[in-house]
Structures are given as structure tokens and as C-alpha cells.
């Protein structure tokens, strides 16, 4: 029995940056540091930061006046930013720059009064933050999750429309929705390149390659991680059993019955240490060799805010 490792896998530049912001804020300012929402969707990472003094909250009313608060990698609405300002909170923004790029598209549409359609998953914090960039009562922003939702929009074919997408979606599903949007609204405008981020795209492509060579695919990632769920769904769609696990403790020996090749990958918010523990556990269960796909190299780096950078360099 052998393992094939996906490449790339695990942390992306936005996650790296977000975790660094919390770590550096704790180092410079000391605990407690408040973080609005889980800074990234990974239980292991969040628990580690909590042990060091990060306090995770869902709303700013849980943060004392004048305290330090970090916005998670998923981004926040304009209303949350304004509330932080009104409360005199010291903010470090860990919003992924690729999410911020989508925020700017929405804000531009809002200023022009152009109606916007966001392709994304209802209730996901990134979607909440992105929709919260639109504040023009003359226009409006509408959420669609799938092709069926487009029929319910009730917008006129001839009105000025623009669309954007959540950054962690399935490339295939999103492509289908965009095709349907353009068919219903031929004049609709959108980004020159889709908003799905490079890391999501690369990890989905790696899982395609992995699934072609595997009898079982294991995705390391938390259940609330959008991009991790999409990786497991993609493998399943290709006809390969897929398991989404938080860590090696979730592995059930029965999964390996009749299996020769196990593909292993990790979502963009899952650290490599978890992948290595999964490999160790699978070796205990009979794996005798580990290979790695060649994949593509990722060199993207996002800098932390300058107030934290001085300490990092020093």
C-alpha cells in the first residue's frame, strides 16, 4: 500500500499571512488579542493560537472598548469596520488580499449603483463580508449558489449587471453558473479572470491528478473549510472515495480494506504538520511507500501590516 501526496497542498499565502498577523500581534502587544471569527478555518491552528492568548469572538460586542482586534482572512463588511472605528478598537486586518480584490469590485459596483451578483455559499463568512461591501440602496447585491438560483433572481435582462465570486469555490461548479448567468443576462460584466484564488485552483488541479492515480483520497482540513470541502467533493465526483479529516485520529482502518493507493492532500488552511501525522498513522496501518506529485510551484507571499513588519524583520 502506498501514499501519493498532492502538490501543492496545505497553507496558501493568505493563510500564512493571517496566522502571522495573530502571532506577531501576540508577540508585540501580549495577550489577550481578540480575533473576529476563526482567523482561518482550521481547528488545529485556532486551538494553537487560543493557547497563546488569542480570543476568538463572532461579534465585536464581545470585544472590550479600545482593545486590539484582528479581522479574519475571510474579510468583514463595511458595517463591521465602522463599528470597530466607532468603538476605538485597534484593528489589524488579516483579510486575504485576494478577498479584498473582490471587495473592491463590489464597492465599485455599489458606487455606480450597478446591481451585483455574487456567486458563493450562503452563510460563509467570506460571502457575508463581500456582500457587506455594497451599501447603495439604488442598486443591490444578490447571492446565487447554483444554476437553479439564477431563475429566481427576477432581474431584467437589459439592466446593467456585474458578477463576482467567492474565492474558494469549485472551479467546475462556478464555471457552470457563470455560463448560465451570461446566457440569461448577455450584457452582464464580470472580472477579466475569475475570482477563484490561485491556491484554490492549484489544489483542485492537484486533486484531479491525485484522484486519477488513487483508490482513496484523504483531505486534511476542517469541516467548516470551504476549500477543503471542495477538494473532497472533486475527488468524489471523479468516482474516488474521499474522506475529509481534521487529523490522523479521524482515520478508520476499515477505510483501507482493498485499497492499494491512498492520495493525500490538505486544504489551504491545514498545516503540513497534520499531513505528516496522517502519513505516520497510515504507515502504522500498512503503508510502505510515499510518493509526491510534481505539481506546480507557488511563490506568492503577502506581507503583514507595516506596524507588525518592523518586529518581524528585527
Swiss-Prot record:
Chain sites annotated for binding (2E)-4-hydroxy-3-methylbut-2-enyl diphosphate: 41, 74, 124, 167, 225-227, 269
Swiss-Prot/TrEMBL GO biological process terms: dimethylallyl diphosphate biosynthetic process; isopentenyl diphosphate biosynthetic process, methylerythritol 4-phosphate pathway; terpenoid biosynthetic process
Metal-binding found in the keyword field: yes
Keywords from the UniProt entry: 4Fe-4S, Iron, Iron-sulfur, Isoprene biosynthesis, Metal-binding, Oxidoreductase
Cofactor details (free text): Binds 1 [4Fe-4S] cluster per subunit.
Residues that coordinate or bind dimethylallyl diphosphate: 41, 74, 124, 225-227, 269
Entry binding sites for [4Fe-4S] cluster: 12, 96, 197
Domain of life: Bacteria
Catalysed reactions listed for this entry: isopentenyl diphosphate + 2 oxidized [2Fe-2S]-[ferredoxin] + H2O = (2E)-4-hydroxy-3-methylbut-2-enyl diphosphate + 2 reduced [2Fe-2S]-[ferredoxin] + 2 H(+); dimethylallyl diphosphate + 2 oxidized [2Fe-2S]-[ferredoxin] + H2O = (2E)-4-hydroxy-3-methylbut-2-enyl diphosphate + 2 reduced [2Fe-2S]-[ferredoxin] + 2 H(+)
InterPro entries tied to this protein: LytB/IspH
Residues noted as binding isopentenyl diphosphate in the record, renumbered to the chain: 41, 74, 124, 225-227, 269
EC number of this enzyme: 1.17.7.4
Residue ranges crossing the lipid bilayer per the database entry: none
Annotated function: Catalyzes the conversion of 1-hydroxy-2-methyl-2-(E)-butenyl 4-diphosphate (HMBPP) into a mixture of isopentenyl diphosphate (IPP) and dimethylallyl diphosphate (DMAPP). Acts in the terminal step of the DOXP/MEP pathway for isoprenoid precursor biosynthesis.
Protein family per UniProt: Belongs to the IspH family.
Protein's recorded name: 4-hydroxy-3-methylbut-2-enyl diphosphate reductase
Provenance organism: Mannheimia succiniciproducens (strain KCTC 0769BP / MBEL55E)
Organismal lineage: Bacteria, Pseudomonadati, Pseudomonadota, Gammaproteobacteria, Pasteurellales
Amino acid at each position: 500500500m502506498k501514499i501519493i501526496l498532492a502538490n501543492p497542498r496545505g497553507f496558501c499565502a493568505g493563510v500564512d499571512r493571517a496566522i502571522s498577523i495573530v502571532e506577531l500581534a501576540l508577540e508585540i502587544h501580549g495577550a489577550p488579542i481578540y480575533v473576529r471569527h476563526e482567523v482561518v478555518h482550521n481547528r488545529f491552528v485556532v486551538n494553537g493560537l487560543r493557547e497563546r492568548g488569542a480570543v476568538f469572538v463572532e461579534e465585536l460586542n464581545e470585544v472590550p472598548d479600545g482593545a486590539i482586534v484582528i479581522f479574519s482572512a475571510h474579510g468583514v463588511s463595511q458595517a463591521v469596520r465602522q463599528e470597530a472605528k466607532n468603538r476605538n478598537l485597534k484593528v489589524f486586518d488579516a483579510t486575504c488580499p485576494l478577498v479584498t480584490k473582490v471587495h473592491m469590485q463590489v464597492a465599485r459596483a455599489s458606487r455606480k449603483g450597478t446591481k451585483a451578483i455574487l456567486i458563493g455559499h450562503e452563510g460563509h463568512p467570506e460571502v457575508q463580508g463581500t456582500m457587506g461591501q455594497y451599501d447603495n440602496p439604488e442598486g443591490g447585491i444578490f447571492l446565487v449558489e447554483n444554476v437553479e438560483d439564477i431563475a429566481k433572481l427576477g432581474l431584467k435582462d437589459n439592466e446593467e449587471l456585474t458578477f463576482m465570486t467567492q474565492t474558494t469555490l469549485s472551479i467546475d461548479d462556478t464555471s457552470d453558473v457563470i455560463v448560465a448567468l451570461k446566457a440569461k443576462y448577455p450584457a452582464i460584466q464580470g472580472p477579466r479572470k475569475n475570482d477563484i484564488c490561485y491556491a484554490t485552483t492549484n489544489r483542485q488541479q492537484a486533486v484531479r491528478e491525485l484522484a486519477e492515480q488513487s483508490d482513496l483520497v484523504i483531505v486534511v482540513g476542517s469541516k467548516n473549510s470551504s476549500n477543503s470541502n471542495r477538494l473532497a467533493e472533486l475527488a468524489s465526483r471523479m468516482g474516488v472515495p474521499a474522506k475529509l479529516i481534521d487529523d490522523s485520529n479521524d482515520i478508520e482502518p476499515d477505510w483501507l480494506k482493498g485499497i492499494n493507493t491512498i492520495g493525500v492532500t490538505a486544504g489551504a488552511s491545514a498545516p503540513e504538520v497534520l499531513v505528516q501525522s496522517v502519513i505516520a498513522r497510515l504507515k502504522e496501518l500498512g503503508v510502505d511507500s510515499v510518493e509526491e506529485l510534481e505539481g506546480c510551484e507557488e511563490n506568492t507571499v503577502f506581507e503583514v501590516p507595516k506596524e507588525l513588519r518592523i518586529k518581524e524583520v528585527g
